[in-house]
Amino acid sequence: MMRTQCLLGLRTFVAFAAKLWSFFIYLLRRQIRTVIQYQTVRYDILPLSPVSRNRLSQVKRKILVLDLDETLIHSHHDGVLRPTVRPGTPPDFILKVVIDKHPVRFFVHKRPHVDFFLEVVSQWYELVVFTASMEIYGSAVADKLDNSRSILKRRYYRQHCTLELGSYIKDLSVVHSDLSSIVILDNSPGAYRSHPDNAIPIKSWFSDPSDTALLNLLPMLDALRFTADVRSVLSRNLHQHRLW
C-alpha cells in the first residue's frame, strides 16, 4: 500500500516537474525573442579606401525601390476577423484614414530593424517607395517611416502599377529609364515579374520579432552600389530562388 502511494507520489512529482520545465522553457524563449527584438544593432560603416572611392565615382548612384506591406511593415485594420499578429501585440503606430467615405484605423507593425536599415541604405542609395496600396494609406505609412528625415521623398502607389490577371505589376521604368541602376526589394514576385533581374526577393513578414532579414541584406546592398549594372549580379540569384 505504501509502495503504491510512493509510486503515485513520484509520478505526480515527475508530471509536475515536466510541466514546470515546459513553462520555464516557454518563458526563456519569450525572453530571448524580446532581447533579440530590442538588442542594439550595429553595422559599421567604415571609411572607403581610395580604391573604393575611385570605383564608386565611376558608376552611377543606384536607386533602391522599396515595397511597404510585408516587406518593411505589416498592418491590419478594424474588422479583421483573423488578424495575423498575435493578440495583445501593440502596434508601432496607428493610422486613421478615410477610404470610400468610411474612416478606417490601421494598426501598423514595423519589421524589426527597419529604422536602422533605412538610415544605413539612405546613405548608399536614392530611396523610392513603390507600393500597390492606395495612396491615402501608403503615403501615411511612408511619412511615419521617413520620420521627418526626407529620405523617402519619391513615392509611387497603386495608380502607378499595371493590373494584370488580378495582380499589380510595378514597372520600374516609371521610376527611371536606366534599369542598370535600379534595385527593387519586394516580398511579392508578381510585383516585379517584368523586371526579375532587378529584384531582391524577401520573405513576407507578419509578426516575428526575431526576424533579421533587413539586417542580412545590408552587406549585399553595400556591395551592389559598386557595380556598373545591378542585373549582372541579381540575375544570378534567380537560379537559386533565394529569399532573404
Swiss-Prot record:
One example GO MF annotation: phosphoprotein phosphatase activity
Pfam families named among the record's database cross-references: NIF (PF03031)
Limits of the FCP1 homology domain: 57-224
Record's catalysed reaction(s): O-phospho-L-seryl-[protein] + H2O = L-seryl-[protein] + phosphate; O-phospho-L-threonyl-[protein] + H2O = L-threonyl-[protein] + phosphate
CC terms in the record's Gene Ontology section: cytoplasm; endoplasmic reticulum membrane; lipid droplet; Nem1-Spo7 phosphatase complex; nuclear envelope; nuclear membrane
PROSITE patterns: FCP1
Family the UniProt entry places it in: Belongs to the dullard family.
Function statement: Serine/threonine protein phosphatase forming with CNEP1R1 an active phosphatase complex that dephosphorylates and may activate LPIN1 and LPIN2. LPIN1 and LPIN2 are phosphatidate phosphatases that catalyze the conversion of phosphatidic acid to diacylglycerol and control the metabolism of fatty acids at different levels. May indirectly modulate the lipid composition of nuclear and/or endoplasmic reticulum membranes and be required for proper nuclear membrane morphology and/or dynamics. May also indirectly regulate the production of lipid droplets and triacylglycerol.
Record-linked NCBIfam families: HIF-SF_euk
Name assigned to this protein: CTD nuclear envelope phosphatase 1
Organism the protein comes from: Bos taurus
Organism ancestry: Eukaryota, Metazoa, Chordata, Craniata, Vertebrata
